[in-house]
């Protein structure tokens, strides 16, 4: 291996390391990790996502249609009730999967409003 090839390989490795560390806002969890002291778990987590989604929708101006809004709220509530059920299953299961997800980001770690809104169902103008 020539010196220039070796230098290129080291530079590429450093670039990958910098890129990976700059995206460090993503949380990872181990299956045996305990909840963060400021983490939100279970039903309060689903309620926090619901509040964050409603805030995001109001900041974006909502759907603008009253008829479509009722259908949109039903869809959002169905999504959030599914999220609550999933959170309860995750709390009850002793063998939780490791990795990333809302439980990892907001229960096992402390998440912010921006991270909560990543879990909002998509809002479309034509919902209804």
Curated annotation (Swiss-Prot):
In-chain residues carrying the UniProt-annotated modification Serine amide: 127
Pfam family, one: Insulin
Keyword Nucleotide-binding: no
4-carboxyglutamate: residues bearing it: 115
Cellular-component GO terms for this entry: extracellular region
Keywords: Amidation, Carbohydrate metabolism, Cleavage on pair of basic residues, Disulfide bond, Gamma-carboxyglutamic acid, Glucose metabolism, Hormone, Secreted, Signal, Toxin
Function: This venom insulin facilitates prey capture by rapidly inducing hypoglycemic shock. Intraperitoneal injection of this peptide into zebrafish lowers blood glucose with the same potency than human insulin. In vivo, when applied to water, this peptide reduces overall locomotor activity of zebrafish larvae, observed as a significant decrease in the percentage of time spent swimming and movement frequency.
Subunit and partners: Heterodimer of A and B chains; disulfide-linked.
Name of the protein in its database record: Con-Ins F2b
Originating species: Conus floridulus (Cone snail)
Lineage per the UniProt record: Eukaryota, Metazoa, Spiralia, Lophotrochozoa, Mollusca
């Amino acid at each position: 291996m020539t010196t220039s090839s070796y230098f290129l390989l080291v530079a590429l490795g450093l670039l990958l390391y910098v890129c990976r560390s700059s995206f460090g806002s993503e949380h990872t969890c181990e299956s045996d990790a305990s909840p963060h002291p400021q983490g939100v778990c279970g039903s309060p987590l689903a309620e926090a996502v619901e509040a964050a989604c409603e805030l995001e929708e109001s900041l974006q101006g909502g759907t603008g249609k009253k008829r479509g809004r009722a259908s949109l709220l039903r869809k959002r509530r169905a999504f959030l009730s599914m999220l609550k059920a999933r959170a309860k299953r995750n709390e009850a299961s002793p063998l939780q999967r490791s990795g990333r997800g809302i439980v990892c980001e907001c229960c096992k770690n402390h998440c912010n409003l921006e991270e909560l809104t990543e879990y909002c169902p998509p809002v479309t103008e034509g919902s209804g």
